[in-house]
Amino acid sequence: MATSGRLLCFCLVLGLVFESLGYSEARPPRDRKRTVTAKRYDPLAQRVDCGGSPCAFGCCENDVCRELDCEYAPPFGF
């Protein structure tokens, strides 16, 4: 009976240790700044003002860094 009680306590302690180790990575704090990958997939973060008209994905019509399939995005007011 004492052995099963010790085994139960040992398993509970191991569970608490492993839960505390993985908890910080599973839920990042809410006040953390947005990461680069989150900005990459956000369409509003990729709009750039190109001479008064907003363009999608940071490409302008007369710019050197024009990308393939560059389309004008609708204005923010829609």
Curated annotation (Swiss-Prot):
Protein name, as recorded: Teretoxin Tsu6.15
Entry's localization field: Secreted
Residue ranges the record assigns to the propeptide: 22-47
Family: Belongs to the teretoxin M (TM) superfamily.
N-terminal signal peptide: 1-21
Modification after translation: Contains 3 disulfide bonds.
Tissue expr: Expressed by the venom duct.
Recorded superkingdom: Eukaryota
Keywords: Disulfide bond, Secreted, Signal, Toxin
One GO cellular component, as annotated: extracellular region
GO terms assigned for molecular function: toxin activity
This protein's domain notes: The cysteine framework is VI/VII (C-C-CC-C-C).
